[in-house]
Amino acid sequence: MNGFSTEEDSREGPPAAPAAAAPGYGQSCCLIEDGERCVRPAGNASFSKRVQKSISQKKLKLDIDKSVRHLYICDFHKNFIQSVRNKRKRKTSDDGGDSPEHDTDIPEVDLFQLQVNTLRRYKRHYKLQTRPGFNKAQLAETVSRHFRNIPVNEKETLAYFIYMVKSNKSRLDQKSEGGKQLE
């Protein structure tokens, strides 16, 4: 699911004959941007309640034209909405937020792809407080929330972490081996 519903989810009322054959055929985008109706041809993406909610949360100047009988939007607005939804707004620090660490174009790090043991190691290293018995999704969410809020260069930190794991120089690995050194 990408947040854009199918034509069955978003169709309201009886469809017109040409629109039923091909979504958006001969129709223009149903959105109004900055008070002006979009004239681009409508694609097969529709303006669902979920998309409308994300637009209102981001305070975008997009609205649906109430005079149209369809909910199809153009590819430009579809890509625009997806890109805005995928961008993560980072909190700026007291220094004005103009440092490279506070760039809003930094992609989201998907920590759910890490193994559970790695997430537990991260939690143990930073002494994060969690309830016992967290599943992987809850653990990844907790670690992700902490990871977003620590003031570090994320790329450098991950590179160093991977280097330490690959070179077997992790203190946690040495402790688990009962005191013998790893080569």
Curated annotation (Swiss-Prot):
> Which gene specifies this protein's sequence?
SAP30L
Tissues expressing this chain: Detected in brain and ovary, and at lower levels in heart, small intestine, lung, kidney, skeletal muscle, stomach and spleen (at protein level). Ubiquitous; expressed in all tissues tested with highest levels in testis.
In the record, Phosphothreonine modifications are located at: 92, 104
Output the Gene Ontology terms for molecular function.
DNA binding; histone binding; non-sequence-specific DNA binding, bending; nucleosome binding; phosphatidylinositol-3-phosphate binding; phosphatidylinositol-4-phosphate binding; phosphatidylinositol-5-phosphate binding; transcription coregulator activity
- Name the UniProt key words of this record, in alphabetical order: Acetylation, Disulfide bond, DNA-binding, Isopeptide bond, Lipid-binding, Metal-binding, Nucleus, Phosphoprotein, Repressor, Transcription, Transcription regulation, Ubl conjugation, Zinc, Zinc-finger
Q: Which InterPro entries match?
A: His_deAcase_SAP30/SAP30L (IPR024145), SAP30_C_sf (IPR038291), SAP30_Sin3-bd (IPR025718), SAP30_zn-finger (IPR025717)
Cysteine-cysteine disulfides? 29-30, 38-74
Enumerate the residue ranges of region (Disordered): 1-23, 85-105
Composition bias, Acidic residues: 1-10
Q: What is this protein called?
A: Histone deacetylase complex subunit SAP30L
Sequence position, cross-link Glycyl lysine isopeptide (Lys-Gly) (interchain with G-Cter in SUMO2): 49, 155, 166, 175
For the modification Phosphoserine, which residues carry it?
A: 93, 99
Q: Lineage from the top down? A: Eukaryota, Metazoa, Chordata, Craniata, Vertebrata
